[in-house]
Amino acid sequence: MKLYESGEDYLEAVLMLQKKNGMVRSVDLARHMEVSKPSVCHAVATLRDGGFLMMDEDHFLHLTDVGREVAEKIYKRHCFFTEQLIAAGVDPKTAEADACRIEHIISDESFSRLKEAAEQEQT
């Protein structure tokens, strides 16, 4: 199943909420992402059917191994670009919004090279 930007955003949000709160329900996701509960319900069903997410009997959301891998990849990119943009003098709110767009479109190769270059600059 091909994941679109919105699906990646949901997985990233589940990961972030799990790190912050431990357990995540659909209502937590709706609040965090500022979307409606029906939107979350639809996204969760799609991600569950795609093998990225599971919901237990208490309605808590859990990332599958594949879902966690995607979420961590997107989250790392998000953090990297946010930090780089802020370091370049971009307003933090703008940096956050721009990082959210960039994280989805950059290739693995380009991201890897940018990250390596940034790490070399720090040494």
Identify the residue ranges that each predicted region occupies:
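Helix N-cap / loop-to-helix initiation motif
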Residues: 36, 89-93
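Canonical helix-turn-helix DNA-binding module
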Residues: 26-57
